[in-house]
């Protein structure tokens, strides 16, 4: 049996941003700092809590129907990346984030280690059909994204996992450089 979970998050497991992940990403949102978004932020993404994914794995154990089959197991809330960031901020009780859109290919060139995934994966729609997992494994998506973020933040706060985003100024540097380049381009085009 093959289980194909997509982005799985939860207590001790990470959230994604286009640049920062995990506690750094959540700290940026909480502080109301601008958030880098790859492309126009309109590609679709799913993020499923690990507890829901675990139930699919349990449903596959000793299940003769599942033998030799493959299953997608992921969220059933299809979020644009823009909405993903907005809902994460909402769950934190933070202000709506200022989203700074930068082309995926440029982000990947600026920091391949952190942003290469924007070009390789995030810029594309990541939606999957869970119907076989629901039918054969008893999978159900029970933890909405906002509730899942709240659970993870509570866990991180209890375990010292919300890192200080001021310790990494890379996202701020990219945002400042991008905004300055855009202003120069507009000024030159207006001549």
Over which residues does each language-model region extend?
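Short arginine-rich
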Residues: 156-163
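Conserved beta-loop-beta element that borders a ligand/cofactor-binding pocket
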Residues: 1-14
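A short C-terminal helix-loop "cap" of Rossmann-like NAD(P)-dependent dehydrogenase/epimerase domains
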Residues: 24-38, 93-100, 131
